[in-house]
A protein has these predicted regions:
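Short, cysteine/histidine-rich loop/knuckle motifs that typically chelate Zn2+
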Residues: 839-843, 857
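Terminal amphipathic helices with adjacent charged low-complexity linkers/tails
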Residues: 237, 298, 303-305, 315, ...
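Conserved, charged catalytic cores of large soluble enzymes
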Residues: 10-87, 173-187, 197-309, 340-344, ...
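Catalytic alpha/beta core of large soluble enzyme barrels
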Residues: 42, 318-320, 372-373, 377, ...
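Function-dense linear segments that define catalytic or interfacial modules
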Residues: 76-82, 96-173, 181-184, 195-198, ...
Length: 864
């Protein structure tokens, strides 16, 4: 009886409300209870307590385990459901959420629904922009302010830079010519890094059209060490550019990019710029590529472009292309949970239950829009009550008014999935094969039809989104696909409309998948088996010492199995508690459906084709990373990107292995040649006349500085630092990242150090007398640091030495921090940061990785 069920829900609501309002738990209490909830999974428990348990501004914790959180969410969604016909009860909703089994609100909805301790949005992501002409300084600063205002409310932000004039364009101010895109990329990046979000940095996506004359500078911007570190960058590629790049033809850039009669045009060699995109992606994983014509052609909201729904950029992870001032909330359906008898010969996918839950997921997402509108009303009320004068508050207030209008008018949702990799394995299908891809396509077609059918049903009960117009949409390729697959659904939609302008996405589900204990999004398993290390006391009983570091600390290596790999083992009679040899582990993996189906060894071209086939049933986009081994060449990246474009993908990102090797240790056995015993590093006291050198730029207070790091056999041997400006400092093109430091002796015996570099055409330029550029105080400290580098003190110890210098001058201390950052990039990946504790989990398990500190226990990272 639904009335009885609703009554139970109300009882739970009162109980949970009292817990949330009155009971305060210590971190240890919440962690221990969550550890029991996740059946001993320390990482899942820690992530939940740190990121998702309700806390007030003093750090008091009001939820003991995810059970409390799920009741909090269920009660709030049930409150909205009670406003509409056939409302779901809190108990019915709780059963969908419990243990992250079926439906999982992601990120901001999980944290914010029913949370009265923070005034924040429920939206995961936003896109902002300016209507009309937007190339003025005022427009650029306006975007900067809006970006910060959204990030302080937990939102990730995306915006496009194609409206900014190219470098050298005439402007009617004291500068006379435009500075171009790159300085503003740095500005927006710095703003992102300033905004703390519960200890996180802000998330930012910057995009630009390949048609923009400054797009090459945009593509290169992050290749300079320390530049634009607070943003992801993606380049919007149109079909004309891709065709020209593939065929080796010229391509015309212009500004404004959409003008029929542009003020500026430039013909370029498309294949040369394409090679640069490929090279940079191969080297640094950026820029990502967005196939913009495909995005616009397939976009249902762009059928209403003239009403304010013209897509201009994407959210930071790329799965939601958005128009200015629209936002989206995310939810994932756990695909693994619909496999009956997983990993058994009679395993099958329960499509009947799945279809029912897809409809409910879309319904819950629509309820969350109502909850979001309430949250925005609360944000605007707080702005009104803040003591600042109206002029100061106006920009933030107007921003939220625009978002409120777009959210209510279009009612956009982001229903997605997670655990695709585990679902396929549980059915005995190998990720990346044709058979697996066909099944995935069937699943995502079911999601699309189910979500749109649910949206049409809600239109009958609750009303369609207010600007729905069938005639506008009738030629949209996605809508035509739905109509062909389900004519009855399309007929109903024409008659009643639908509740939501767009419904679907596939987002990365990083922390979500930790709590579902599955693979992430549509990705394959990263590793089915990996190793971690923990420090042990060798005198304790039952301790197995596998590794002793140079300080004498003992460590035990232990095998960690992917959760669903354990399920496969148990289903096939293998004991997960046994201590296996490396050979036995290799044999186990080879017998499992995860064999040759990990992120590093899946068939990459097939993965791209799979993404394209699934994309046909996702109205927004898909966030996917193609993980590649370190030794692949640039040609493979080229082939993957071209295949992604041809297959109908809306975007693509590649990531070459190496950036997180300090977190997970592959258990693959590799025979290595016997190395001779270690010997002390060779000290070269007589400096060679010429040393290769890296150029590292950094900020010292408000001044721009540059460091020249001389290298001997790849190891830092000396460091020179100085101002970088046009007058008395060092004038050096931004494109210069390496060169040579040459030691010269003048006729009077005076030593001099010169820096020499080559430009793109091979011509050499020499900057004489580096030491003459220095303040003597900096020069003396640089000599000290160079001395310890020359005698091969370990880099991490040099950094510790520099950090311990007690200096009175604030500018010297800022310079010191810049030197530390410059040297960190030379620390060997995996080097332990001794004596440092992870600020996230408190363990002394930090290692250096590409100049950043990464925790091998919880995965937290900190750079700079």
């Amino acid at each position: 009886d639904r009335s009885v069920s609703r009554g139970l829900g109300d009882v739970y609501k009162r109980q949970t409300h009292n817990i949330v309002e009155k009971q305060i738990y210590s971190y240890d209490e919440a962690y221990e209870e969550s550890l029991r909830y996740f059946q001993g999974d320390e990482l899942a428990a820690r992530v939940w307590v740190n990121k998702y348990a309700v806390k007030d501004s003093f750090g008091n914790i009001y939820e003991k385990s995810p059970e409390d959180m799920h009741w909090r969410i269920a009660n709030e969604v049930a409150r909205i459901e009670s406003k509409y016909p056939n409302g779901l009860t809190a108990k019915e909703l709780y059963d969908l959420l419990d243990h992250f089994k079926y439906i999982v609100p992601q990120g901001s909805p999980m944290t914010g629904i029913g949370n009265d301790y923070q005034v924040a949005s429920l939206s995961n992501c936003f896109v902002i922009g300016v209507d009309g002409a937007a190339d003025s300084y005022g427009a650029i600063i306006k975007i900067d302010e809006e970006q910060v205002q959204l990030m302080k409310r937990r939102g990730g932000v995306g915006h496009d830079l194609s409206h900014i004039r190219p470098k050298g364009s005439p402007v009617k101010n004291s500068a006379l010519t435009s500075t171009g895109l790159v300085p503003f990329m740095e500005r927006y990046s710095n703003s992102t890094r300033e905004v703390a979000q519960d200890g996180r940095r802000g998330a930012l996506m910057l995009s630009v059209s390949i048609k923009h004359p400054d797009s090459e500078a945009f593509i290169d911007a992050k290749m300079t060490e320390g530049k634009v570190t607070g943003a992801n960058v993606s380049v919007k590629l149109d079909d004309a550019f891709m065709q020209a790049a593939v065929e080796g033809k010229p391509y015309v850039q212009q500004y404004p990019i959409d003008a029929a009669n542009p003020a500026f045009t430039k013909e370029i060699d498309a294949s040369t710029l394409w090679k640069k995109i490929v090279h940079n992606a191969w080297k640094s994983a950026e820029p990502g590529v967005l196939f913009w014509d495909t995005i616009i052609r397939e976009s249902v909201p762009d059928c209403y472009a003239d009403l304010g729904y013209k897509t201009v950029s994407t959210n930071p992870c790329g799965e939601i292309p958005l128009c200015p001032y629209d936002s989206c909330r995310l939810l994932a359906i756990n695909l693994y949970s619909y496999v009956v008898n997983p990993f058994k010969p009679d395993a099958y996918f329960d499509f009947d239950l799945f279809k029912k839950h897809v409809a409910l997921a879309q319904r819950i997402m629509d309820d969350i829009i109502d909850l979001e509108l309430e949250k925005i009303e609360r944000i605007m009320k707080k702005i009104d009550e803040d003591p600042e004068n109206e002029e100061v508050k106006r920009a933030e207030r107007v921003l939220w008014e625009k978002i409120y209008k777009k959210s209510g008018q279009g009612r956009r949702t982001g229903v997605g999935i997670t655990a695709e990799g585990d679902m396929l394995a549980a059915l005995g299908l190998r990720y990346g094969t044709e058979e697996a891809t066909e099944f995935s396509e069937k699943v995502h077609k079911t999601v699309a039809l189910g979500a749109y059918r649910s949206s049409v049903e809600m239109a009958k009960e609750r009303g369609a989104f207010e600007i729905y117009n069938n005639e506008r949409e009738q030629n949209n390729p996605f809508i035509k696909r739905l109509a062909e697959a389900d004519p009855e659904l399309y007929a109903e939609m024409k008659k009643y409309g639908r509740r939501n302008i767009a419904c679907l996405t596939i987002a990365p589900t990083g922390t979500t998948s930790l709590m579902t204990q599955t693979t992430s999004g549509i990705e394959p398993v990263f590793l089915p088996v990996y190793k971690r290390r923990r420090k042990v006391n060798p005198n304790d009983t039952n301790v197995h010492v596998d590794f002793v570091d140079e300080t004498g600390d003992a460590f035990e290596e232990y095998i960690v199995f992917h959760h669903k790999f354990v399920t496969w083992m148990e289903a096939n009679g293998y004991d997960p508690a046994r201590r296996y040899t490396q050979e036995e582990i290799d044999e186990l993996v080879a017998k499992s459906p995860y064999y040759k189906a990990t992120s590093n060894d899946v068939d990459w071209l097939m993965k791209v084709k799979m993404q394209g086939r699934i994309q046909k049933w996702v109205d927004h986009s898909i966030s996917v990373t193609i993980n590649l081994p370190n030794d692949v060449d640039e040609d493979l990246v080229n082939r993957l990107y071209v295949e992604a474009w041809k297959s109908g993908c809306k975007g693509c990102t590649v990531y070459r292995d190496g950036s997180r090797s300090g977190v997970l240790i592959s258990t693959k056995s590799e025979k290595k040649e016997e190395l001779p015993p270690c010997k002390p590093p060779t000290v070269v006291e007589v400096r060679p006349k010429v040393l290769e050198a890296d150029v590292v730029r950094f900020q010292n207070n408000k001044e721009k500085w540059v460091a020249f790091v001389g290298l001997l056999d790849g190891h830092p041997y000396e460091i020179f630092t100085g101002l970088q400006d046009d007058d008395e400092g060092i004038l050096l093109p931004k494109s210069v990242t390496c060169g040579r430091i040459i030691k010269n002796v003048d006729e009077d015996g005076t030593k001099r150090y010169d820096f020499q570099f080559e430009n793109k055409r091979g011509y050499k330029t020499t900057i004489e007398g580096l030491s003459e550029k220095f303040n003597k105080e900096y020069w003396n400290y640089a000599k000290l640091i160079s001395g310890v580098l020359r005698y091969r003190m370990p880099i991490e110890q040099v950094i510790k030495l520099v950090g311990s210098l007690q200096l009175n001058s604030e500018s010297i201390n800022t310079w010191k921090n810049g030197v530390e950052r410059a040297l960190k990039k030379y620390i060997q990946d995996g080097t332990e940061a001794k004596g440092k504790k992870c600020p996230n989990c408190g363990n002394e398990t930090l290692v250096y990785q590409e100049g950043c500190l990464i925790c091998t226990t919880c995965g937290a990272s900190r750079c700079g």
